[in-house]
Amino acid sequence: MITVGYSTRESKPEFIEYLKKSSGFKKLEVIEKVNNGTKSLARVYNEILLEAKTDIVLFCHDDIYFDTPAWYSKLLKHFEKTDFGIIGMAGTTSMPASGMWWEDRKKMVGIVNHEKDG
């Protein structure tokens, strides 16, 4: 099984419902952590790891949408390969001084889609 965890400034029950529906897995464990900047994201993610009832934890933001329908089973298949311990969808090969990993698009890796006003 997979746990999905995210940090948010305010509770978003509609996002929890979206995650469950889009995953295609009704029993998806979702851990929402309301955090108004009092804790670092790393600390919140560590709390999620401690609370998770599964060995696989997906961290995400509270404003994402999955382009892949029924993504749960597809993601789970990747973890059946024992040579994976961590899987990422997007990032950079080098972190600029600004901390904005998307600043140099030539160093971006993965898939990032943004809505026009998002």
Segment roles from a protein language model:
Residues 57:
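Short aromatic/hydrophobic "clamp" motif used to bind/position activated sugar donors
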Residues 1-24, 31:
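N-proximal low-complexity "stem/linker" segments adjacent to membrane-targeting elements
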Residues 14-21, 43, 47, 70-77:
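Alpha-helical elements of Rossmann-like donor-binding domains used by nucleotide-donor carbohydrate transfer enzymes
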Residues 27-39:
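A short beta-strand-loop structural module common to alpha/beta enzyme folds
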Residues 65, 69-108:
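Conserved donor NDP-sugar-binding/catalytic core segment of glycosyltransferases
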Residues 36-52:
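Glycine-rich, basic loop-to-helix element that forms the pyrophosphate-binding segment
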Residues 105-118:
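Short, flexible, basic/aromatic active-site loop/helix in glycosyltransferases
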Residues 60-62:
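Active-site acidic Asp-centered loop
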